[in-house]
A protein has these predicted regions:
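Short, charged beta-turn/beta-strand-edge "cap" motif at the junction between a beta-strand
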Residues: 240-244, 258-261
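A conserved acidic, glycine/proline-rich C-terminal tail/linker
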Residues: 215-243
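N-terminal low-complexity, intrinsically disordered patches enriched in charged
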Residues: 52, 241, 247-248
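Catalytic-core "active-site belt" of small-molecule-metabolizing enzymes
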Residues: 2-209, 251, 259-267
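Conserved phosphate- and dinucleotide-binding cores of soluble alpha/beta proteins
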Residues: 202-206, 214, 224
């Protein structure tokens, strides 16, 4: 376990890395005894720094929802991070590339809550009951921590990703919002185009067999900390495509079939 000073130092390093756009060394190398709980404590400390600086919590994200990603990360459950007010971009907007380090785009569904949601024992049915709208969403992920250590060639571990706010950096909401019982949320097909070329496609069932399962998992995971998911919060349910790298000048268009589409451009 890390001590309180190590936790604060790590959070400050992440904050400086985001501001300077210069990645820091992997925490899993600097702190070989780091645990999953340490990583979440670092994440909470970094989010607290941001909120102290004027940011507002707007919701949460769920990551590592596919079985393949969990196996590759040597874990058996998803991870989560915080969504802050300055992470949201309008659909169709120009997104400044200079704000990020190595941005990538993922395809998701977002749950907009209409009622409080709290574990333990939260189920998919509780999530559907508490959700006011489901809407297409793009998540922009980034890495403030080095993905590969230049000295050892070690790849980052799940401890690094969790500390790094589960890699979250931005959100674009768009397309057609629907009530959670209006469609089968498992069967939303998507096609992602980058500069007019199909790069990824997927279906929403790839998220834990039902995207609402991730939201239930999050409510249960946060229950020991007495955290309630609140009305109006945005919950990103997890990606059902592989991430696609974004470069300056890239235009993204994602077709969600009956739920419309989302477009954005990095400048």
């Amino acid at each position: 376990m890390l001590d309180s000073q190590q936790i604060l130092d790590a959070a400050l390093r992440l904050d400086r890395a985001e501001r300077s756009r210069e990645q820091v060394r992997q925490f899993s190398l600097d702190y070989p005894n780091i645990t999953i709980e340490d990583a979440y404590t670092i994440q909470r400390a970094w989010v607290a720094l941001k909120i102290k600086g004027g940011r507002t919590l707007k919701g949460h994200k769920i990551g590592l929802t596919s079985r393949a990603m969990q196996v590759s990360s040597n874990i058996t459950e998803p991870d989560y991070g915080a969504l802050l007010d300055d992470m949201f971009f309008d659909e169709g907007s120009d997104i400044p590339f200079e704000r990020f380090i190595v941005p990538r785009v993922e395809v998701e569904l977002a749950f907009i809550l209409g009622k409080p949601l709290k574990g333990p024992n939260c189920t998919v049915f509780d999530v559907l009951d508490a959700t006011e709208w489901v809407i297409p969403a793009l998540e922009i992920i980034d890495a403030r921590i080095q993905q590969v250590d230049p000295q050892t060639n070690a790849t980052r571990k799940v401890f690094d990703t969790i500390s790094d706010n589960a890699a979250n950096a931005g959100v674009v909401l768009g397309g057609r919002a629907v009530r959670p019982t209006e469609i089968d949320l498992r069967k939303v097909p998507t096609v992602l185009y980058r500069n007019g070329v199909i790069e990824e496609s997927g279906v929403s069932a790839a998220v834990l067999n039902h995207p609402a399962k991730g939201v239930a998992w999050l409510a249960n995971k946060l229950a020991p900390y007495d955290v309630t998911l609140l009305p109006g919060q945005v919950i990103l349910g997890g990606s059902f495509t592989r991430p696609v790298a974004a470069r300056p000048g890239d235009t993204f268009h994602v077709d969600y079939d009956l739920l419309g589409s989302i477009a954005c451009r990095f400048i």
